[in-house]
Design a protein with these regions (language model features):
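N-terminal flexible segment immediately upstream of the FAD-binding catalytic core
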Residues: 1-58, 74-104, 264-273, 325-346, ...
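C-terminal substrate-recognition/cap domain of FAD-linked oxidoreductases
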Residues: 21-29, 241-406
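Short, well-ordered beta-strand elements within core beta-sheets of diverse protein domains
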Residues: 43-48, 219-221, 228-233, 291-292, ...
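Glycine-rich, histidine-containing beta strand-loop boundary motifs that form or position
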Residues: 69-73, 80, 91, 110, ...
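FAD-binding subdomain of flavoenzyme oxidoreductases
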Residues: 96-100, 106-110, 114-249
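Generic structural signal for well-ordered, non-membrane alpha-helical segments
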Residues: 2-6, 46, 50-53, 110, ...
Length: 406
């Protein structure tokens, strides 16, 4: 890394927040994307404000050096792995949280994790109801740039549906504010779709290519305290997918509905069954694990009764293993990471969204590929938003076996 560039970065953020030490660079060469090779950056800089990010990008432009924004480093598809010799802009110092209780919104800096935000909001009886399954380490801003989904998405959709506005530093170093906060006279974030086009949406799911998000404004809701957990079994995938559609058609307040094949559930139970307190179960060909929640207990009871009725009308039955959805929900901040690494192997993953009638065909193709090449893997998924099913196939490999990895 050019010493002149390093000196200019130090002038912006302070010497203690710039590093070219080999051990530090090695740390930032990887992320949670274990199935991908790391690349060593030339320097890491840790700004403490949006204005510092802007000045850093101006310097990067001057020296024509590639920039990789990074916060929690929990991305699963190599988004946070830097360019060789490039500059990592690490955003974890941006820790501000501002609540706008009357506007039912909150603004968080790019270094705030979902776990930190949830702890803060819990003190006010509030929450953001959509989480990734790595929330103790995943930052809100990092999840926004991949348009993440997870527990809560069956009811509320992806994290994009929670976003009210963004503070973004463009590659040129220009700072912009989207949503209602773009009006300097606005009391705070209360409207995403202000006059004109949806500029906010340009940056959601952009993987940081169009600018660096330094703060995110989100909707908040009154925290739910009443839940129903249950599992529903079906003989065909058509019955299972129809069950989820009918729950949505009947406005059942399903926060999270996961789909499992019987063989996949057995695989998961080897990893988490004992911890969740789930006894040996003969799982049906298809299981839907359901979390129903509401601020009112009577609505939860009514919705749970209707879910059972719909299940039986479709030819299914109630499995009565509430420990599975309860474990998924109560452990939602860290389930994914623990389950994925339980076997000590590395894995590659590819999230994809499908219509209710299309997902099964994709699963069949995935299984054919796994069988053809003798690979260990699985796929499961959950309903997201209005009519989308989100599936995430995993392919496991032994990191010590280069032939297996290849």
């Amino acid at each position: 890394m050019d010493p002149k560039l390093v000196k200019e970065l130090e002038d912006i953020v302070g010497e203690e927040y710039v590093s070219t030490r080999p051990d530090v660079l090695l740390t930032y060469s990887h992320s949670a994307s274990t199935g991908y090779d790391g690349r060593i950056p030339g320097a890491v800089v840790r700004p403490g404000s949006t204005e510092e990010v802007a000045e850093i990008l101006k310097v990067a432009n001057k020296y024509k050096i590639p920039v990789t924004p990074r916060s929690g480093g929990t991305s699963l598809q190599a988004e946070a792995i830097p360019e060789e010799g490039g500059l990592v802009v690490e955003l974890l110092r941006l820790k501000e949280i501002t609540l706008f209780e009357d506007l039912r919104s909150v603004r968080v800096g790019a270094g705030v994790t979902f776990g930190q935000l949830d702890k803060f909001l819990n003190q006010h009886g509030l929450w953001v109801p959509v989480y990734p399954e790595s929330s103790l380490a995943c930052t809100v801003a990092g999840n926004v740039v991949v348009n993440g989904a997870g527990p809560g998405s069956t009811k509320y959709g992806s994290i994009a549906e929670m976003v009210m506005g963004l503070t973004v530093v463009l590659p040129t170093g220009e700072i912009i504010q989207t949503g209602s906060e773009g009006n300097p006279n606005a009391p705070g974030p209360f409207l995403r779709y202000s006059f004109g086009p949806d500029i906010t949406g340009l940056f959601i799911g952009s993987l940081g290519m169009f600018g660096i998000i330094t703060s995110v404004s989100l909707k908040v809701y009154k925290r739910m305290k009443h839940f129903d957990y249950n599992t529903y079994g079906f003989q065909t995938h058509e019955q299972a997918q129809r069950f989820v559609i009918e729950m949505k058609n009947n406005e059942i307040n399903v926060l999270f509905a996961s789909f499992y094949e019987g063989q996949i559930l057995q695989f998961f139970m080897e990893m988490l069954g004992e911890e969740y307190g789930i006894s040996k179960t003969d799982w049906p060909p298809y299981t839907v694990s359901v979390v129903i929640g509401h601020v009112r207990e009577d609505i939860v009871r009514s919705d749970a009764a209707l879910a059972r009725e719909l299940c039986e009308k479709l030819g299914g039955y109630v499995i009565n293993v509430p420990e599975l959805p309860r474990g998924e929900w109560e452990d939602r901040f860290r389930t994914f990471a623990r389950a994925s690494y339980a076997h000590g192997w590395h894995w590659r993953i590819l999230y994809h969204h499908h219509t209710p009638s299309h997902w099964r065909r994709v699963i069949d193709v995935i299984w054919e590929g796994l069988d053809k090449f003798g690979l260990l893997g699985h796929t499961a998924g959950f309903a997201t938003g209005h009519a989308s099913f989100n599936f995430y196939p995993h392919i496991y490999f032994d990191p010590a076996d280069k032939e297996d990895e290849g």
